[in-house]
Amino acid sequence: MFKIVDKQQLTPLIYSLWVEAPRIAQSAKPGQFLIVRPSDNGERVPLTICDYNPDNGTVRIVVQIAGVSSNKICNLNVGDCLTDVAGPLGKPSDFMEIPEEELKGKRYLFVAGGVGAAPVYPQAKYLHERGAKVDVIIGARNKDLIIMEDEMRKVCSNLYICTDDGSKGEKGVVTLLMERLGNKYDMCVAIGPMIMMKFATLMAKKLELPITVSLNTLMVDGTGMCGACRVSVAGKTMFACVDGPEFNGYDVDFDEALRRQTLYRKEEQQANAAAGLEFKR
């Protein structure tokens, strides 16, 4: 069992949990994720590792209530336990293969959409600590969905915020800020809703900027056996859980990935309705 040692509510629907998981905390790297099961009869929920502390053996996950299982996780309290936490899964971020001395002075632009700020944080932190220049864009529908602003400011050179309704930061979408910042980076990394990553990739192409995206496809087992997370990358079938979750944005068939994300929309709506849950899409 994996005990929850800290819980914070970041927004009305987003929670931060620190969980005891010593083995995972010792081996976790930026870019990797976990499969979490809240109860014996609960679903397996893929969640990116937001932070990890090898010294006290804890990992941090950020969960947005979007259905029955995520609602179960967010309703647990300090002292409660998750039934299963498997990981770390997936490949670490590509920059983990670059010698640390070569990262110093490199320029990275991170583009986070909504809860995508959570997986961006450990990557920005790792690069910042090794002397890279990190700029971060966080975009969301409104100010109530902006998370981790204070923490992000500590691990980047510049933080830019935009909201669809203009309630915080600039009014508009992340691609407008990308275009304004221009091609002055060695790499762009986009993490968030699939549609946001698609248009961030199109903007990166316009700017002639290399871009990596982290795909949040459907997942079940997290080891490549079920095939639920398959995506087309450079014309080949890849599994986001073992070949990713990060891929070259230019190679991803986003339209196919977007279609696959709606495969079980009806079943999700039925399950939410049965549990008395209602969410805006």
Feature locations, PLM:
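Short, surface-exposed secondary-structure boundary micro-motifs
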Residues: 39, 87-88, 234
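Structural signal for conserved beta-strand scaffold positions within catalytic alpha/beta enzyme cores
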Residues: 6, 51, 161-163, 213, ...
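Ferredoxin-reductase
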Residues: 1-80
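FNR/FR-type flavoprotein reductase catalytic core
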Residues: 71-220
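A generic structural signal for residues embedded in beta-strands
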Residues: 36, 84-85, 231
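Short, Lys/Arg- and Gly-enriched loop/turn segments at beta-strand edges
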Residues: 42-51, 89-100, 241
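Local cysteine-cluster metal-coordination motifs and their immediate loop/turn environment
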Residues: 119, 194-195, 216-246
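Short Fe-S-cluster ligation motifs
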Residues: 239-243, 247-281
